[in-house]
A protein has these predicted regions:
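Hydrophobic beta-strand segments that make up the repeating blades of beta-propeller
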Residues: 57-59, 120-123
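Metallocofactor- and cofactor-centric catalytic cores in central/energy metabolism, strongly enriched
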Residues: 115
Length: 147
């Protein structure tokens, strides 16, 4: 059933049941990461990062116990609220080579994100209780940030 809209099993679906027309709105953003789920987000309102990040969403993807996920993606939004292409903003939390066929368990698993009063981002980990501070270094008036 390619491109079909189905009701999830946790909401009474059976893998074939479609919702009534108009019952659900179309999602603004979808994430198609294998074995990874968006678990938290923050819309950036600070001024410590370049203006291109203002109003966009930083989304935490929580990976499974294999090589997928474990990162923070950025989704820009235009003035009309339309999302742009999402891109990985911060990665490396898993602390293993993602190209490995059997990488083993991840060292860290991002679970939450917040914007601090200083405009930095704070990412929390569910594996070891660590919190990372991500701050922009350079002139925030420049158009793009480097990782």
């Amino acid at each position: 059933m390619k491109n079909a809209r189905l009701i999830s099993p946790e909401y009474g679906g059976d893998g074939r049941k479609s919702p009534a027309p108009g019952a659900y709105s179309t999602p603004v953003v979808t994430f198609h990461s294998r074995r990874s789920a968006p678990v938290d987000l923050v819309f950036y309102s600070g001024k410590a990062f370049p203006g291109a990040y203002r109003g966009g969403a930083f989304v935490v993807l929580h990976g499974t116990q294999n090589k997928y996920g474990y990162n923070v993606v950025f989704v820009p939004f235009d003035r009309n609220g339309k999302p742009g292409a999402q891109a990985v903003f911060a990665d490396g939390f898993a602390a293993f080579d993602p190209s490995s066929a059997t990488p083993g368990p991840a060292r860290y698993r991002p679970i939450g994100i917040a914007e601090g009063p200083d405009g930095a981002l704070y990412v929390a980990d569910s594996q070891k209780g660590r919190i990372w501070r991500i701050a922009y270094q350079g002139d925030p008036s420049r158009r793009t940030a480097s990782r």
